[in-house]
Structures are given as C-alpha cells and as structure tokens.
Amino acid sequence: MIKKLFLLVRSLVILSIMLYLGNLIAYYIPSGVPGSIWGLLLLFLGLTTRVIHLNWIYLGASLLIRFMAVLFVPVSVGIIKYSDLLIEQINILLVPNIVSTCVTLLVIGFLGHYLYQMQSFTHKRKKVIKRRENQVKQAN
C-alpha cells in the first residue's frame, strides 16, 4: 500500500515537474505554444532518451487518463456559456479550421504517397542489384 502510494506520488511529481518546466519555457520563449505542450515535448524527450522511465510515470498517467472526461467538464461548460459569442464569430473560427484541416490532409497524403514510393523504389533497387550480382556470379 505504501509502495503504491509512493509510486503514485513519484509519477505525479514527475508529471508536475514537466508541466512546470513547460510553463517556464513558455514564459521565456513567447512563441504562442502553451506551457502544457512544451511540458509534453519535454516528457516525450525524456521518455525517448530514457532519462525518464515509463514505469516511473505509468501509475499517475493512467490515473489522469482514467478521469480525463471529468477534467474536460469545465471546458465544455465554458463552450456552452459562451455559445452566443461562438455563433457570432463562426466565420472567423470555421474558415481557418477547415483550411488547416484540408492542408493537413493534403500534406499527410502527399507525404505518405512519397514515402510509399521511396520504400517501393528501394525494394525494386535491391532486387535489381541482387539480379546483377547473380548475373556476374553466373558469368564467372
């Protein structure tokens, strides 16, 4: 019981430190990127470089994910509270969202097509090289 409590506190402390560091970066680098996103990037870098082990944050992260719906209730209430303002500004909000979605889909589509062709080309090139090596061996 005490060990599980220690693991939970440790994971929440690590997640809180990442959030704090992200907010610190957002304060000193005014790029418009929120501190929570910077914190997620720091957490991602820590996990990929294995500075932070997954089992260190697993318990706290799973607890937060379990109650994620409850954490989004204030956002939903804010949307309902200011729905008249959102309806007034629908053109300003809707057009950029549609354009950015279309641009994202196009970029992902072209990138996926390009990467698929590169993989296919690499496979074909390896087959040609192997065939030429076999022809050289047979000629000798």
From Swiss-Prot:
This is UPF0299 membrane protein HI_1297. It comes from Haemophilus influenzae (strain ATCC 51907 / DSM 11121 / KW20 / Rd). Keywords: Cell inner membrane, Cell membrane, Membrane, Transmembrane, Transmembrane helix. The keyword Membrane applies. The chain crosses the membrane at residues 1-21, 33-52, 60-80, 92-112. InterPro entries: LrgA/CidA, Uncharacterised_UPF0299. The lineage of its organism: Bacteria, Pseudomonadati, Pseudomonadota, Gammaproteobacteria, Pasteurellales. GO terms for cellular component: plasma membrane. Belongs to the UPF0299 family.
